[in-house]
Amino acid sequence: MMTNKLHLSTLGIALLLLFGSCGGAEKKVAENDGLETAADRVEKTELPPKAEVGEGALVRAELIYPLENRPTPQVHASTLVETSNGIVAAFFAGTHERNPDVGIRVSHLENGKWTRPEEVVNGVQNDSLRYPCWNPVLFQPADGPLMLFYKVGPNPREWWGMLITSTDGGKSWSAPQKLGEDPAIGALIGPVKNKPVQLEDGTIIAPSSIEIEQDGETFWKVHFEISRDQGRTWQVVGPINDGVAFDAIQPSILIHDNGDLQVLCRTRQGVIAESWSSDQGQTWSEMQATSLPNPNSGTDAVSLQDGRHLLVYNHSTKEGEEPNGRNILNLAISADGKTWEPFMTLENEPNKAGYSYPAIIQSEDGMVHISYTYDRETVKYVVINPSDI
């Protein structure tokens, strides 16, 4: 459900070429009307140098497992959660994204060290059919078992959402369950990449999106899957965009002090897009462009205990001088969700596959934990002290 207000910012009107990505074909090209583009803004933004551990807010930075003797050739789409037993990470891993051998692996931070990741679920359907797994999302509700959402299917247009749960902090897991179907979107997806949020009344809102093929084009649309019974049933809200003004997927949810919700979304328009809700996610404003660039790559965001908001993202476009695309990874901070200031560069040294698909959480002790794909070969984990920002 959407409101009727539509106001694209200057940045949103001056669209870049639309690029395809995994799960989406290239399509329509918007005209540049001479206004400032995302690439122009990238050039004008002075980013800080790459952060070093012990300087400023960066407390820790390490690979979850070394490149040598790694358990699988490739890994992607990590997720983090804090449990009573500590920090847990999950990601999909196998020979290559989309290959049937890709499953979901889990690693635990124990006594200051990460355990070797172990596969906890895969896409085996029967003795002769196995699909790849995609985009795990860990979530610990206030009252209930640890949840691990993931997707199974041949591609993002045909996948479906699955769920396993754990009552011992991710040491053992329940049998997989399919999330179900909904008339608005078909198969329920669950949180498509980024973590759900839980409201004070216990409502869980999972940020999600779908990719729809129509007349030879692929349209990206954001929606929400909402549960009021600890994930047993789900209500779908949306899609909230038409996939034309903005091709948007993979939203992350911020919660503001006044109760308003805000989503920040990956797009194919060269910018991060946003939408707002003032009724606990039941209706949403029309999407607008933010001031931040996006090279068609995943982002994540978190609302801090002190009311500020952090966003981890690639501050770049697909074109221009290196580092561009996914070869730079940044942190930005905002007091109101509208004005963002890039304050830390996590990576800026070009490599083969870049730094991408970050996840970000804040633990009870106030520290901020971030994970992200590192050259598609391992996952990097960093810790930020927000009191030093």
What function would you assign to each model-found segment?
Residues 2-11:
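Bacterial N-terminal signal peptides that target proteins for export
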Residues 23-389:
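Asp-box/BNR beta-propeller blade signature and adjacent active/binding-site loops
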